[in-house]
Structure formats: C-alpha cells, structure tokens
Amino acid sequence: MKISKSSAWDQGRIFSFLSENTIPVRLAVIQDKHPLICSVWFSVDAETLEISCVSHGKSQLVKSLMADPRVGFEIALNDPPYKGVRGKGNAKLTQENVSNTLHEVIVRFLGSTNSNLARWLLGRAEE
C-alpha cells in the first residue's frame, strides 16, 4: 500500500489500526457500469500493508474484478470518533494460498474455525 504524504498515520499506525480492529473492508467495484459495494473479511501484511481477501470464485465480486480490477476501499469505524484507512488500487486475483488466507480471516473475524459458519466456509475453499 502506498501511503499518501498527507496521511496523518504512518505505516506502523496503519498496520496497528488494521490488525487491532475486526472491521470488514468495504470494497467498491464496478459491475455492469454501476458501483457495487461489498464488505469482505481481510488480513493485512505487516511489511507491505497488502490487504488479502477471499471470495468465492463465482461471486459477483470476483466476476466484477475479473472485468475491471480497479477498486476503492475503506476500513473504518462506524462510531465517533470516525477514523480509518481508505484508498484505491487494483485488485490482484489469485488462487494461491486460498485455504491459508481463508483460515486466517476466519480465525481473525470469528475467533476460531469451530462454528458452523467457519466449517461451511472452509468446506467451500476448493470451489
């Protein structure tokens, strides 16, 4: 992630915010010439601040990104004081490490892989 020179936060503060809060990333993509907003669980790399998400291969999100990889994103608190991270970029779609990334985001957002939802999501990892 490239940090704007005018940003109030440095890389360390951005990583702290992203790793300490379990707020889904809101992705804005283009679908059929109209904006589509999706909330998606994510993980973040401490060194690069690269955000990794997992979505089913047949999802509208993936179909939209295959047609146009440009995204806008926001990871922000819903309550005052409002703060967060937002930006734009290009999504990179890959099937590498899908199971590992899925496991990581499930544990991050659900706390474990023991719930029915977690088992259902993990069961669809190869689809």
Segments predicted by a language model, with ranges:
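Short, solvent-exposed aromatic-acidic interface loops
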Residues: 55-60, 109
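Helix-adjacent hinge/juxtasegments
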Residues: 61-88, 92
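Charged, gly/pro-rich active-site loop segments
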Residues: 1-9, 83-127
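Short beta-strand segments
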Residues: 22-57, 71-75, 85-86
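Short, basic/aromatic recognition patches
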Residues: 2-26
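Short histidine-centered beta-strand/loop micro-motifs
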Residues: 53-55, 63-64, 76, 101
